[in-house]
Amino acid sequence: MGEVKDWRPFVYGGVASITAEFGTFPIDTTKTRLQIQGQKIDQSFSQLRYRGMTDAFVKISREEGLRALYSGIWPAVLRQATYGTIKFGTYYTLKKLANERGLLINEDGSERVWSNILCAAAAGAISSAIANPTDVLKVRMQVHGKGQHKGLLGCFGEIYKYEGVRGLWRGVGPTAQRAVVIASVELPVYDFCKLQLMNAFGDHVGNHFISSFIASLGSAIASTPIDVIRTRLMNQRPVSITMNGVVTAAATPKLYSGSLDCAVQTIRNEGLPALYKGFIPTWVRMGPWNIIFFITYEQLKKY
């Protein structure tokens, strides 16, 4: 019977991820807008339009409509269908393999932290690299909002036309790094907290809620600087050039040459705190996202 259930962590992870994405996506949109603003070397996003998460939420809703908060939701759903399914399925599969080889459980019955971290890091890196194109589409659509893009297929066509297949893999390095950091912190911390709280709360919703909240704070602190770099790299595109009234595009963007260059220029031009732009919406979103995800996941496991 155990063999039959091997596919279930993958399906449960995907369904729970998509459910959580729908519930928290507007917060993610405000985070993306905050992270790309204030880039002094990019005139399109040099202005500080939003003072914070609440201001961004209000202005986007008022100026672009409530639907703009869900710009990019479909590539986000596609991302979770791949990223979420592969990440959580791979994580729990690797844990099972580690357990079978005696690498997971200590003599006192507790789980080994290093084993959990390695399983989570591997799962995060693999899944994020595979899902990177959907992440690029999501960021592009979030930045421009409703009415300024042609939808999922239109955005895909524009990237392919002007940037080629490589355009869909912009930011794959920091994306994988971010996924490794989040997975290495979030999943082991959740499992650790859940185990520690088992005597007080049992394997119930209260335990899942508290464990999710603690896990989200740690992952937000660790991952936000990488997330800022990732978002900026994904959003950069060929610079528009007008010649004889015809708009063309340069062969390559000249804003950032890579992750390190983006980090250096961001700190130099905007200061070190710029790497934590969007931290509040990141944490505010991670909390509910993890709570929705893990509660959904735990409930699905019962069937």
Curated annotation (Swiss-Prot):
Topological category with respect to the lipid bilayer: Multi-pass membrane protein
Pfam family, one: Mito_carr
Cellular component aspect of the GO annotation: mitochondrial inner membrane
GO molecular function annotation: transmembrane transporter activity
UniProt KW keywords: Membrane, Mitochondrion, Mitochondrion inner membrane, Repeat, Transmembrane, Transmembrane helix, Transport
Function in brief: Regulates metabolic homeostasis in response to nutritional cues and may therefore be involved in adaptation to dietary variations. May not function in creating mitochondrial proton leaks across the inner mitochondrial membrane (i.e. mitochondrial uncoupling).
Protein name per its UniProtKB record: Mitochondrial uncoupling protein Bmcp
Organism: Drosophila melanogaster
Origin organism lineage: Eukaryota, Metazoa, Ecdysozoa, Arthropoda, Hexapoda
